[in-house]
Structure formats: C-alpha cells, structure tokens
Curated annotation (Swiss-Prot):
The modification Phosphoserine is found at residue 141. The gene is pop3. Its main location: cytoplasm. The target of rapamycin complex 1 (TORC1) is composed of at least mip1, pop3/wat1, tco89, toc1 and tor2. The target of rapamycin complex 2 (TORC2) is composed of at least bit61, pop3/wat1, sin1, ste20 and tor1. Interacts with prp2. The lineage of its organism: Eukaryota, Fungi, Dikarya, Ascomycota, Taphrinomycotina. This is Target of rapamycin complex subunit wat1. It comes from Schizosaccharomyces pombe (strain 972 / ATCC 24843).
Amino acid sequence: MSVQYPPQHSVLLVSSGYDHTIRFWEALSGICSRTIQHADSQVNRLCISPDKKFLAAAGNPHVRLYDINTSSQMPLMTFEGHTNNVTAIAFHCDGKWLATSSEDGTVKVWDMRAPSVQRNYDHKSPVNDLLIHPNQGELLSCDQSGRVRAWDLGENSCTHELIPEEDVPMSSITVGSDGSMLIAGNNKGNCYVWRMLNHQGASLLQPVVKFQAHQRYITRCVLSPDVKHLATCSADATVNIWSTEDMSFMLERRLQGHQRWVWDCAFSADSTYLVTASSDHVARLWELSSGETIRQYSGHHKAAVCVALNDYQI
C-alpha cells in the first residue's frame, strides 16, 4: 500500500512511548500518517536531525535512526554500545555526529557516517539527560546522583561538576539557544538556573536562582527557542510556563488537561506553541497565548513519554 506523506514544509509531530510504536502525525489535522513498530523495547526519547531528514529513537539499549520521508519500517542505522536505557539524544548542528546518554552511567559520542563510539564519558551514575551547548564544543549532562556536568570536547574532559542538591536526582537540563543560561530540574520539583559566561571559548557557570516549579517530580524542562519562556513538565499532570525576563521566572501559565504524568514537551520554532506527551496515552498541542489545547493526538495504548516536532511554522 502506498502512503501519501505531507510535503516537506508541513508540520510533523512524532510521539512514542511504552506501546512500542513511533507515530507520525500531521500536527494541524491530527491525522496519524505513519506508524513504525519498535518491537524490542519502549522508546524513551525522540530527536529530529537539524536537516529534518532523520529521526533518532532512544530505546533499551539501542538508538535507531529512521528516514522521516519514507514509509519504511526499517531503521537506516542502529547505534549499539549502551547497556541500559538510552535517556537522551542530541545531534551536532552539521549532523556529522550525535551524542547519547544512558542509565548505564555513560555519555557517548557517535560518528554518523559509521555508527561507532568516538568518545565515552563516565558519570558513575545513571545519566538522565544530555544536550549539546550552542557553541557545539561542549556537552552538558545530568544524573541520578544530582550532578550536572559539562564536558569539553576539545579537551576531552569534564570541566564543570555542579551538585545543587546532593542525592536528589537531576532529571532534566536545558540551555538557551543563545548560550545565555543553563537550567536543571530535579525530583523535588526544584529548578536551578545558571548564567553562562564565555571565557576564552569555554563556559563559566554562575549560579543565579533556585525556584520551586512543582510540588512533585520535574520530568522535563525546556527553554523556548526565543529564550523568553521555560516550560516545566511534571508528575503532577501539569506543564508550567515561566517567564525568563530578568531571570525572574514568574509563572505565566499553567497548562492543565492531561490526566497523568506529563513526560516531555517541545516548543514550536516560533515559540508560540507547545506539544506534550503524557502517561494518559495522549499527546497535545497547546496554544501558549491562551493556554488552550488546540489538538489532541490519540492512538497510543500505553504511556506516551516523548515527542519531537519538525516545524518551520505553525
């Protein structure tokens, strides 16, 4: 059966989770246009490549790379080397390599041309999240012991180790697209904010503020592309939207509608919409100006725990 795919410029939402499927949705119509069976494990995280051609799916213990613009069920590439759940994926801006983190306690850097490990960094604790600094020369990661680490790819070493709350798992980190700030959220619902200063090509991290974002676990924190807002997802079934103006972190809006834990979120490119994934099996598209759900994506029959958005404009 031939499947018709939306044109390149349309908005594509991808969701996945514990039902072993990856679902592609036309974001505006809510139509599921493609389903990939991910038979051997749940999917923990999704990431779309900078050129919008590929989708990386983090499972246990593999990472699989899929072609977004075909109907094939088969991955183009499988990255093998982790020994436990893969928790995060980040693509380098030119797409030549990607980085991953895992509950096996490591951060790995992979060559995209041949799926081999180029770098291996040991956290000595399960790693919960990972990202690439906008300067493309540093990795930032956080772990179950409460540590946030910065890794200099040029020096091939850990340059910062931050421990805001000892033995409180740090669940998520996010960095401003302009490299201005780093934010980490933990299992007590607290967010920690650091100002990022450039010193001779390397980042200096200056503590700014701690605030309680939720009463329960933070599952994900994400800065908007324009760095004007922070979204925090939580076990309390809500998403809070915070203003970053003057590092004030005033609560602007609470997004309510999910029935269970909200695990993941992603902003639209213009920072005006947010997509979320929840244990209630549903993904949602929110208009941030009104706080309203404008589209629901129902199709998963177990928890939806990760989303990715491939958009140019909504």
